[in-house]
Amino acid sequence: MNLNFTSPLHPASSQRPTSFFIEDILLHKPKPLREVAPDHFASSLASRVPLLDYGYPLMPTPTLLTPHAHHPLHKGDHHHPYFLTTSGMPVPALFPHPQHAELPGKHCRRRKARTVFSDSQLSGLEKRFEIQRYLSTPERVELATALSLSETQVKTWFQNRRMKHKKQLRKSQDEPKAADGPESPEGSPRAPEGAPADARLSLPAGAFVLTEPEDEVDIGDEGELSSGPHVL
């Protein structure tokens, strides 16, 4: 049985008869792809994008680009895609970088510039500090105007100067104590190092303490053993 069908309306030379045999189906070759130049990418694409037979564009395999020569922190507002097709069509990245990358340490607290006072300003501040340690608001404004400073600068300077003055006083008070050492005040009896602490505290004026080794004991008047220091 022959299953070949031919159309009577068209000549045999213009159209190949359709066959449903397995051999004819396996030997059938697909139609070649049509190339259509895109309109909106005509200026940027170097080559044409091939289209499938049903009209959808055939996208070639994306190729990974090498890293940009410039650091991503210094890039402009334009965005460089990570992938480009072989025809030059950009493909957006899955995880794009933020538009404005933060610099390391951006949120660190910036240190304020240190105020530099002139010699005349320092002299005026020191003279006022010797007279008065604390200033009221009107006094600060008056002094700041006289020295061509701001009220905040005068207030900050007086705070730092008071802290410095307190440290100097504390240091001057600690130096005599370090020079004297652990000696007792003049006029008070000093007990030997081996005497107990309670004996040292309860000594009368002018008393002298004798200390003996711990293995030696004395016999009292009533025949009892007694140890420890004896006060003469």
From Swiss-Prot:
InterPro entries from the UniProt entry: HD, HD_metazoa, Homeobox_CS, Homeobox_TF, Homeodomain-like_sf
Any one of the GO BP annotations: brain development
SUPFAM superfamilies: Homeodomain-like (SSF46689)
Coiled coil location: none
Pfam family name, one: Homeodomain
Annotated segments matching region Disordered: 160-232
CDD domains named in the record: homeodomain
Top-level lineage group: Eukaryota
Biased composition (Basic residues): 161-170
Biased composition range(s): Acidic residues: 212-224
DNA-binding region of this protein: 108-168
Compositionally biased spans, kind Basic and acidic residues: 171-180
UniProt entry tagged with the keyword Transcription regulation: yes
Keyword terms: Activator, Cytoplasm, DNA-binding, Homeobox, Nucleus, Transcription, Transcription regulation
Tissues with expression: Expressed in brain. In brain, it is restricted to a few specific developing brain structures such as pineal gland, telencephalic septum, hypothalamic pre-mammillary body and arcuate nucleus.
Gene Ontology CC annotation, any one: transcription regulator complex
One term of GO molecular function: DNA-binding transcription factor activity
UniProt xrefs under PROSITE patterns: HOMEOBOX_1, HOMEOBOX_2
Nucleus in keyword set: yes
Similarity remark: Belongs to the distal-less homeobox family.
Described function: DNA binding protein that function as transcriptional activator. Is essential for normal postnatal growth and nursing. Is an essential factor for neuronal neuropeptide Y and agouti-related peptide function and locomotory behavior in the control of energy balance.
Protein name: Brain-specific homeobox protein homolog
Species this protein is from: Mus musculus (Mouse)
UniProt lineage: Eukaryota, Metazoa, Chordata, Craniata, Vertebrata
